[in-house]
Amino acid sequence: MIEITKRTISFFKNLTFIKQIDKDTVSDSNNSRFEFIQKEETLAVEMPVALVYNGISHTVMMATPSNLEDFALGFSLAEGVIDRVSDIYGIDVEETCNGVEVQVELATRCFVRLKDLRRTLTGRTGCGICGSEQLEQVTKKLAKLDRTFCFELKKLDGCLALLQQAQTLGKQTGSTHAVGFFSPQGELLAIREDVGRHVALDKLLGWHAKQGKPQGFVLTTSRASYEMVQKTASCGIEMLIAISAATDLAVRMAEECNLTLIGFAREGRATVYTEKVRLKI
């Protein structure tokens, strides 16, 4: 297992992931008229999370304030800010009056490179393209992925069930995305949830890196956008499965880097877009 050196993590007890509110719900009580019924609802917390590298703010994402160490690490790897886990010397999570700051201490080499590639963005819910200064950064070239394992498609139904069962936040709120990492045998190794699909994936990629990048694949409750493909492939993961559809750019990018891309994953069916050589029927 790879660990961050000089790790400095501080979390606040009042940094919560869900909130309880009273709200009026309209329901058809007797099939003839609607009425307001007051009930308690559980909401997922969404707040600005700023990533600050060596004291300089780099990006602000709207996110759920959980697993923020994983988020910082995964984002840094997927965006090319760092090359390896050891490029981060410390992570400190600080609550502010407006949100959360994740202070990341970078190796000097990476910080110099970051200043050259600087982009400052204020994402909507997990939007990772907003604010890019150069269009080329959006469609950056990815290395070809190796083909190191084969997955039996008959195990996909079980994976979908495991991901559904493990969505603690999603079950409580109904408003979050979930991303799970599975072994080639279909074992659920980790799950991360967030109001933003890209942020949820960043959190999972951070976990994946800390574990030494084990073999396996990603299963997400969202669609497969080009950025989901880009982030997954850039971290060396060979397969991405989405419950919803893929976009055309996502498919083209998956073809270019040899990533197995699957969409519309449902019980008993799925759409294979690319690289079916990793699949066994």
Curated annotation (Swiss-Prot):
Record keywords: Cytoplasm, Molybdenum cofactor biosynthesis
Subcellular location: Cytoplasm
Main localisation: cytoplasm
Active-site feature positions: 127
Domain of life: Bacteria
Single GO term (MF): sulfurtransferase activity
Cellular component, GO annotation: cytoplasm
Protein name as catalogued: Sulfur carrier protein FdhD
Organism this protein belongs to: Mannheimia succiniciproducens (strain KCTC 0769BP / MBEL55E)
